[in-house]
Amino acid sequence: MTSCVAEEPIKKIAIFGGTHGNELTGVFLVTHWLKNGAEVHRAGLEVKPFITNPRAVEKCTRYIDCDLNRVFDLENLSKEMSEDLPYEVRRAQEINHLFGPKNSDDAYDVVFDLHNTTSNMGCTLILEDSRNDFLIQMFHYIKTCMAPLPCSVYLIEHPSLKYATTRSIAKYPVGIEVGPQPHGVLRADILDQMRRMLKHALDFIQRFNEGKEFPPCAIDVYKIMEKVDYPRNESGDVAAVIHPNLQDQDWKPLHPGDPVFVSLDGKVIPLGGDCTVYPVFVNEAAYYEKKEAFAKTTKLTLNAKSIRSTLH
């Protein structure tokens, strides 16, 4: 008999929009739900929509002083509060106070953090822990409900790449990333896709709380391997751009020798190494400053045990 994991019922959920102030789908949806939350209301659940970086939203910029989605590490969260701290670090401490504290029993059960990308990634769920049966089950449910529209899972578990995301204060952190959409722009198709992903996620939680047992499942995920910078000249400036064959080909297999970059004089730079990879965040606008042209991932399968709520 397959073992069933009994999990505590979910009680508190937050929906974050505006972690990056120019990614407008989450801003638009959360602002709407703050005025009328009927769409995200679920019986027996506390669901709190929240604008995480209001100053950046007001200016329609990614951030004010630094990236809010990279400062939720214990070092920043424990710094003594002062006006000298970057705005986003102060804001992170406020958010941690409201929805955390991180790694504590009082923290919110689930945080959905809504993002857009300029890359052609479609519907993407971001997973931080490959051993989390509850989230693998949730993602399987969302993927099944979204079909035939693809919904990819990006696993950012890595020994040296530490993200310290806004959502990481929750017991179950969920990144929802939908693109392509230019920053500072709203697209109806992207809006609809994100809305549907969140609906299915909330439905899953409600069914789980009501006692439904979810049988064992498996999902394909794309696990981060490394980030690839643009070729640069001696001054540190970008010396080549994403090759047309790679542009908009997120999640597609990229083989050694395939063209990756092309310079102004027509020089083609191929993929090195000896293994096939799957690129994501290809030519993401916000990652130029992070010196990231794309991320290499490897494709693998994650399995989850059967789960049910301890109340049933």
Swiss-Prot record:
The lineage of its organism: Eukaryota, Metazoa, Chordata, Craniata, Vertebrata. It comes from Rattus norvegicus. GO terms for molecular function: aspartoacylase activity; hydrolase activity, acting on carbon-nitrogen (but not peptide) bonds, in linear amides; hydrolase activity, acting on ester bonds; identical protein binding; metal ion binding. N-acetyl-L-aspartate binds at R62, N69, R70, Y163, R167, Y287. It is an enzyme of class 3 (hydrolase). Pfam families: AstE_AspA_cat, AstE_AspA_hybrid. Belongs to the AspA/AstE family. Aspartoacylase subfamily. This is Aspartoacylase. Keywords: Cytoplasm, Hydrolase, Metal-binding, Nucleus, Zinc. The active site is at E177 (proton donor/acceptor). Binds 1 zinc ion per subunit. The gene is Aspa. InterPro entries: AspA/AstE_fam, Aspartoacylase, AstE_AspA_cat, Aste_AspA_hybrid_dom.
